[in-house]
Amino acid sequence: MAVGLGPLPALHPVPGFELGISSAGIKRPGRKDVVVMRCAEGSSVAGVFTLNAFCAAPVILAKQRVQGTVRYLLTNTGNANAGTGEPGLVAARRTCEALAQLTGVDASAVLPYSTGVIGEPLPVEKIEGALQAALDDLSVDNWAAAATGIMTTDTLPKGASRQFTHDGVTITVTGISKGAGMIRPNMATMLGYIATDAKVSQSVLQDLIRDGANKSFNRLTIDGDTSTNDCCMLIATGQADLPEITEAKGLLFEALKKAVFDVCMEVAQAIVRDGEGATKFVTVEVNGGGNHQECLDVGYAVAHSPLIKTALFASDPNWGRILAAVGRAGVPDLDVSKIDVFLGGVCIASQGCRATTYTEEQGSAVMAEAEITIRIELGRGDCSETIWTTDLSHEYVKINAEYRT
């Protein structure tokens, strides 16, 4: 079940960015599993990619090509084309070449993306056979269909859109994402595509998506695994009648930054809300750190703990598990007598011990909620970080045990 995630909001079309969807039947016949995106000529494209050393063949190619001239993004679901060695690279190149031949662009102007089962050969012929139908379907209004087309174990499509006005010109930022499992920071089993009609230099665009992803996609964790295939792409088509943004300053840049960050945050949190088998959406706030890294270390120790995640699923306020996770986070010279821990607004531990005012009934009431905040005050400094995660349910085990069957 998705926690607090409803139907897609209105996804505003982005001038100069079209999407087309078709079926290659990669995992099952008739399923829409190929998405082609076309960028207007002169668009800037930037991206961030998985840090997994076993990164997939399409990731390797996309990273090589992203700073060049990009006209098309080609996505398939049902097959990750990861762990496939040189044949996987050959297969990824073949799909790009097939699309290039149909559209009259150079193959280097096509960026490939794949998601699905790892270690199986990419069914190149099936993808090639679906390309013309996807091209015939290209439309600026196809964001919702594309959000469905990139899904794997997701239960709902994910998207967000923002608009703002500058000097009388409306700028649009729209994005979609997919992901429900193998979610771990530094990009997870996640694909994200965000487009705007602003005109932005490639260097500024790259910094923008890096910073936006760092505060959103890179603060998610569902199961602690980092995928081989992740990426988040930001495309600026330059169709809006405004000057090019060439520096990370000024009113136009700040307005665009806010819109991009808002879209990143919304589609990133949607991934957690739709986490495989999730019944709880959990925010882990760590305040009072001496530096940001120790806040993250504590936050991830809590968010990754199977004992805490199963307690969340059971609505069991087992606060000792939270203290244990904080203590093993590896923060040097941690003074536990300064640590306070809260469940929602309830103080469960004060100065490293059970709070004198805390009752089990208070904790149980918070843990029964669908959305829970665990707040940890370290008392060491002024740094803070926030991470989003889920509980760990029977359904998560079932989904992943049956993934290839």
Swiss-Prot record:
One of its GO terms (biological process) is ornithine biosynthetic process. Heterotetramer of two alpha and two beta chains. Keywords: Acyltransferase, Amino-acid biosynthesis, Arginine biosynthesis, Autocatalytic cleavage, Cytoplasm, Multifunctional enzyme, Transferase. It is an enzyme of class 2 (transferase). It catalyses: N(2)-acetyl-L-ornithine + L-glutamate = N-acetyl-L-glutamate + L-ornithine; L-glutamate + acetyl-CoA = N-acetyl-L-glutamate + CoA + H(+). Catalyzes two activities which are involved in the cyclic version of arginine biosynthesis: the synthesis of N-acetylglutamate from glutamate and acetyl-CoA as the acetyl donor, and of ornithine by transacetylation between N(2)-acetylornithine and glutamate. GO terms for molecular function: glutamate N-acetyltransferase activity; L-glutamate N-acetyltransferase activity. Belongs to the ArgJ family. This is Arginine biosynthesis bifunctional protein ArgJ. NCBIfam families: ArgJ, PRK05388.1. Its main location: cytoplasm. The active site is at residue 189. SUPFAM superfamilies: DmpA/ArgJ-like. The record marks 115-116 as: Involved in the stabilization of negative charge on the oxyanion by the formation of the oxyanion hole. It is found in: Cytoplasm. The record marks 188-189 as: Cleavage.
